[in-house]
Amino acid sequence: MPRLFFFHLLGVCLLLNQFSRAVADSWMEEVIKLCGRELVRAQIAICGMSTWSKRSLSQEDAPQTPRPVAEIVPSFINKDTETINMMSEFVANLPQELKLTLSEMQPALPQLQQHVPVLKDSSLLFEEFKKLIRNRQSEAADSSPSELKYLGLDTHSRKKRQLYSALANKCCHVGCTKRSLARFC
């Protein structure tokens, strides 16, 4: 008798779960028209909800198939094990390396001095230094930071901001779905 009761209770729970999923899907497709603070508050509320997930953002609800363990373990862990194995081999050979005397391992002072650049013409270096300062000042006058520009990092953040501002304009003037706001979480 208790098994039958638990079986019926399980069925009711599954039905309620399906109903809440249908309500959540229709809630995510609800069109809202908000501007300014109200839009930001709605975005925070949508992103802060614990009930939505990346799976609810996708249109299709494909069942998840279990993946093999090799796919779950990231590849960098395998690379780390290779590095650890190589380091352990190195440590095993370390006593042979320590047999070298300190004088053999350190180069002499004249050998080090040949790598130090000699300042022959200080006025020429001063002119190059002034040109470098002028170039830096002209780069600072540019609208974007030079370091980010050369690294290519500013384009991604600019594109992301432009996409979000376009979505904000659309939400303010036309309206947008909560699902489209949730994509920016």
From Swiss-Prot:
Q: What is its main location?
A: secreted
Query: What positions belong to the pro-peptide in this record?
Result: 56-157
* Disulfide-bond pairs as recorded: C35-C172, C47-C185, C171-C176
Q: How does it assemble?
A: Heterodimer of a B chain and an A chain linked by two disulfide bonds.
Question: Which GO CC terms are listed, alphabetically?
Answer: extracellular region
Role according to the record: Relaxin is an ovarian hormone that acts with estrogen to produce dilatation of the birth canal in many mammals. May be involved in remodeling of connective tissues during pregnancy, promoting growth of pubic ligaments and ripening of the cervix.
Q: Which UniProt keywords apply?
A: Cleavage on pair of basic residues, Disulfide bond, Hormone, Pyrrolidone carboxylic acid, Secreted, Signal
Q: In which tissues is it expressed?
A: Isoform 1 is expressed in the ovary during pregnancy. Also expressed in placenta, decidua and prostate. Isoform 2 is relatively abundant in placenta. It is in much lower abundance in the prostate gland. Not detected in the ovary.
Gene3D superfamilies registered for this protein in UniProt:
Insulin-like (1.10.100.10)
Q: Which family does it belong to?
A: Belongs to the insulin family.
Query: Which CDD domains does this chain map to?
Result: IlGF_relaxin_like (cd04365)
Q: Output this protein's name.
A: Prorelaxin H2
